[in-house]
Design a protein with these regions (language model features):
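Membrane-proximal periplasmic segments of bacterial cell-envelope enzymes
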Residues: 1-146, 188, 195, 208, ...
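Conserved, well-ordered alpha-helix/loop/beta-strand core segments that scaffold catalytic motifs
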Residues: 34-35, 138-183, 188
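Beta-lactam-recognizing serine transpeptidase/beta-lactamase-like catalytic domain environment
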Residues: 131-146, 157, 182-229, 236-480
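Short amphipathic alpha-helical segments
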Residues: 42, 46, 157, 161-164, ...
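Short helix/loop capping segments that flank catalytic or ligand/cofactor-binding pockets
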Residues: 86-89, 164-165, 466
Length: 480
């Protein structure tokens, strides 16, 4: 019917078009529902006219509108976005929101903190119970729930500390770029969290484009970008060895070149073509690749013999054991962070038996920075995987936009406990301590020993591929 009306018959003035626009908005909602009639900013004179005719405009009133503005901070992307009143409720979530009493044109959080804490930030609508008579006239109108303002959130992140972490990353990355050591680098990222509570104190990143001389802040990259971790996973690999019975306690194995039939040897940096008997603790301290590969071979149901061929009979079981163990620490699974949209890592479904060996020393699956932070926090706090969170407390809305009084705190959430006894956990903790603080010349983290605070840690170097305009650059990625 509308298509049958010729264009020349639709001849409205500018004022009439405004009336049609407002009327169409009014008709878009059900009876007794509230709708915000979108207009341009009203002048004081226009507001006065509406107020003077209030008795004639039953159900219509002038109200202040708002827009969400975030500060110019590197953390602003974590805040997320809010839908416009025109867009209203996201289509995919509309049904759930309507059940909770939302209106179709309510503005809601669509990403990150705004979405995660939507119900806290939104506030509550006034709920009325309206009855009508047979003629449709209002018989009674009772308020059964008073409306209230939304709450405020206080983050666990201190902006000054956050900036300090960003500056450190920026200085280090700038130095690497100047020394032509970061041509293919994707940047530098760091997450600082309280290992016992999960409170995130800083999540900082400096994103670098291949070949560029500059970089930019990228806090979101700590939860969305994945990286091949390298040797940092070796504490979890020991755990896989213990839980499967492949190794026991602080077992001594010989670090030696691993020669698989028709394949280049896998070696550790400190032995190369030689051999050295080392404990599990020293395997972490020195960052032994071949100790971990021998664990992987045992997971395959074999014992290492130079020149051997690998059996695929237990390939899936071995890879599952490694990945399930890594997941206990938070690698390859959701960390439980109070932000939607975090990556769970890149865990390829297709793999071969050689990938099982490289997985054991961190050269196959990829993880986010916050997953690796949760991994080391689980070791530091005595064996509990604690969900990280960036909101510390929820506060009432104070006067004039102030924080208000504390309403509730975000409690520590333990997701699982590690499959480690106290002796096994102690071996990993000692190994991480010795990485930095050992007197051995083979300790891989001695450069951090002069820090003013005591540090334990695990170093890792990933060997990956990078491409440029001339094709593919292969950085000696170890293959079998």
């Amino acid at each position: 019917a509308i298509n049958a009306v010729p264009d020349e018959a639709v001849d409205y003035s500018e004022d009439e078009l405004k009336i049609v626009y407002i009327y169409s908005q009014m008709n878009a909602v059900s009876n007794f529902s509230t709708v915000i009639l979108k207009t341009a900013d009203l002048t004081p004179d226009q507001i006065a006219i509406v107020a003077a005719k209030q008795k004639e405009l039953n159900g219509i009133r002038v109200a202040k509108d708002w827009e969400r503005h975030t500060s110019d901070s590197s953390l602003s992307p974590l805040i997320g976005r809010v839908s416009s009143s025109e867009a209203g409720l996201p289509q995919e979530d509309a049904k759930d929101y309507l059940k909770k009493g939302y209106a179709l044109n309510d503005r809601v959080g669509t990403s990150y903190l705004e979405k995660e804490y939507e119900e806290e930030l939104q506030g509550k609508h006034t709920v009325r119970e309206i009855t009508v008579d047979k003629e449709g006239k209002v018989d009674s109108d009772k308020i059964i729930q008073k409306g209230s303002k939304g709450n405020n959130l206080k983050l666990t992140i201190d902006l000054d500390f956050q900036k300090g972490v960003e500056d450190i990353l920026g200085q280090q990355l700038s130095s690497e770029i100047s020394g032509n050591k970061a041509t293919y680098s994707e940047g530098m990222y760091a997450v600082v969290m309280n290992a016992d509570t999960g409170a995130v104190l800083a999540m900082a990143g400096q994103k670098h484009e291949q070949g560029a001389q500059d970089f930019k802040a990228d806090a979101l990259g700590t939860i969305t970008d994945v990286f091949t971790p390298g040797s940092v996973v070796k504490g979890a690999t020991l755990t896989a060895g213990w839980r499967s019975g492949a190794i026991y306690g602080d077992q001594v194995l010989t670090d030696q070149p691993i020669n698989i039939a028709s394949s280049p040897p896998i070696t550790s940096w400190f032995t190369n073509k030689g051999s050295r008997a080392i404990t599990a603790t020293q395997a972490l301290e020195y960052s032994s690749n071949t100790y971990m590969v021998q664990i992987a071979i045992k997971l395959l149901g074999q014992q290492y013999v130079p020149g051997m061929s690998l059996s695929t009979d237990n390939m899936e079981k071995a890879m599952t054991t490694l990945r399930d163990t890594y997941a206990e620490f938070g690698m390859g699974v959701s960390t439980g962070l109070d932000l939607p949209g975090e990556s769970e890592g890149y865990i390829p479904k297709n793999y071969n038996v050689a990938n099982v060996l490289t997985e054991a020393f961190g050269q196959y699956d990829s993880y986010t920075t916050i997953q690796l932070a949760q991994y080391v926090a689980s070791i530091a706090n005595g064996g509990k995987r604690v969900a990280p969170h960036i909101v510390g407390g929820i506060y009432d809305a104070g006067k004039n936009g102030s924080l208000g009084t504390l309403s509730s705190t975000v409690d520590t959430r333990v997701l699982n406990k590690l499959s480690l006894d106290s002796k096994q956990l102690g071996i990993i903790q000692q190994g991480f301590h010795d990485v930095v603080n050992s007197g051995s010349s083979l300790a891989t983290g001695k450069a951090m020993a002069s820090s003013i605070i005591p540090i334990s840690g695990k170093t890792g170097t990933a060997e990956t591929y990078a491409t440029d305009g001339s094709g593919t650059t292969d950085d000696d990625n170890e293959t079998l």
